[in-house]
Amino acid sequence: MRYTGLMGILLTLVNLLQLAATLRIAAFNIRTFGDTKMSNATLSSYIVKILSRYDIAVVQEVRDTHLVAVGKLLDELNRDIPDNYRYIISEPLGRKSYKEQYLFVYRPSQVSVLDSYHYDDGCEPCGNDTFSREPAIVKFFSPYTEVREFAIVPLHSAPTEAVSEIDALYDVYLDVRQKWGLEDIMFMGDFNAGCSYVTSSQWSSIRLRTSPIFQWLIPDSADTTATSTHCAYDRIVVAGALLQAAVVPSSAVPFDFQAEYRLTNQMAEAISDHYPVEVTLRKT
């Protein structure tokens, strides 16, 4: 009995050491994330539980202009450990009255924000902008990983414009390189990069896919949806030799929170119709 208990403690310590030796990053489209969802104790508890898995999490489909829901989220994330998480959020983005924000939550004990900017994709009133929700780009410094500085570029594409928007991320890549002199860049989020929105014949027209600069970590065969569909909408794409080398092999996966927490279909879809997509970076 003592031996069994000791082995359990040792296994727990090994797991903790493994977690401490890595940096876990995710993108999560939380459907219509706002005060209504964060005011529901059950839903908010699962959202906090999911996001607590990550050192950096990019939350998409945030609809919280006055940051009421974001405030509640940070209160819960920091309930047990003060200043465990901080955040940076974009302005409301969208061509018409419907707007969304990109929210980054991160552990300041693991990474720090060096800089951020909104990609200039053209004139919205003129109708010649590229993205429905242009990327809000954040540069991080990570003192403990093999790659010290890297940028995260989020995208929640408009489904009917997924092909052109994913292709245009190549231009965002060039812009980030020119602005910051940085090659280690991670693109992530709900690209709507699958099923009827991006068909097999359309991949050849997407520079982010055809260029050897980029590694696509979530395969076309993946299912990133919490619904009855089987689509690889959510993706992670990495550029830069240091960042690519820092990726732990086979760590880029959708996180099936329904299976992990044994949720009903109804409860899972109430949280979101998407799973987070996650990846782990090695620490030195």
Swiss-Prot record:
Site positions per UniProt: Nitration by tetranitromethane destroys a Ca(2+) binding site and inactivates enzyme: Y87
Any single GO BP term: regulation of neutrophil mediated cytotoxicity
Domain of life, source organism: Eukaryota
A GO CC term attached to the entry: extracellular region
CDD domains in UniProt: DNase1
EC main group: hydrolase
Keyword Calcium: yes
Catalysed reaction equations from the record: Endonucleolytic cleavage to 5'-phosphodinucleotide and 5'-phosphooligonucleotide end-products
Main location: secreted
EC number(s) per entry: 3.1.21.1
Pfam annotation, one family: Exo_endo_phos
InterPro entries: Deoxyribonuclease-1_AS, DNase_I, DNASE_I_2, Endo/exonu/phosph_ase_sf, Endo/exonuclease/phosphatase
Cofactor note: Divalent metal cations. Prefers Ca(2+) or Mg(2+).
GO MF, any single term: deoxyribonuclease I activity
Subcellular location: Secreted; Zymogen granule; Nucleus envelope
Gene3D superfamilies membership: Endonuclease/exonuclease/phosphatase
Residues in the signal sequence: 1-22
Intrachain S-S bonds: C123-C126, C195-C231
Glycan-modified residues: N40, N128
Family statement: Belongs to the DNase I family.
Job description of the protein: Serum endocuclease secreted into body fluids by a wide variety of exocrine and endocrine organs. Expressed by non-hematopoietic tissues and preferentially cleaves protein-free DNA. Among other functions, seems to be involved in cell death by apoptosis. Binds specifically to G-actin and blocks actin polymerization. Together with DNASE1L3, plays a key role in degrading neutrophil extracellular traps (NETs). NETs are mainly composed of DNA fibers and are released by neutrophils to bind pathogens during inflammation.
Record's protein name: Deoxyribonuclease-1
Organism: Rattus norvegicus
